[in-house]
Amino acid sequence: QARKFFRKSVISAYEGRCCITGQSIPQMVIASHIKPYYVCDKSERANPANGLLLNAFYDRAFDQGLMTVLPDLTIQVSDYVKDGYDDQNTRDWLLGVEGTKIIRPKRFAPNRDMLAYHNEFVFLR
């Protein structure tokens, strides 16, 4: 029930659009936890402010710490990516969004504490 509530709430908050690209194909957007699900308490798991709506590519990059969202909602890409990959796709898909801001949700703004957790414990420096 909590997962269903979380997913529906995050999709609604972002109006079904990836907060990075604006892409809205339902099968390609994922309600991603900012603070990872496995370390959340029960209330954090269901809290839509602990969510970003991301397309599948950015969901995976975010979960793996290859990118993060700073408290001012700016996207930052890991030095791991910057220093290790210089192919065109990496430049376009990851480095191309660095420094841009995510599209703000109409409600349930990303929780600053959850963003801080991701920045400190998930993001690869």
Q: Predicted regions span which residues?
A:
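The −1 position to Zn-ligating cysteines in a subset of zinc-ribbon hairpins
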Residues: R17, I30, L54
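Internal active-site segments that recognize and position negatively charged phosphoryl groups
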Residues: Q1-G22
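A detector for short metal-coordination/catalytic motifs
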Residues: F5, Q23-P26, K35-R125
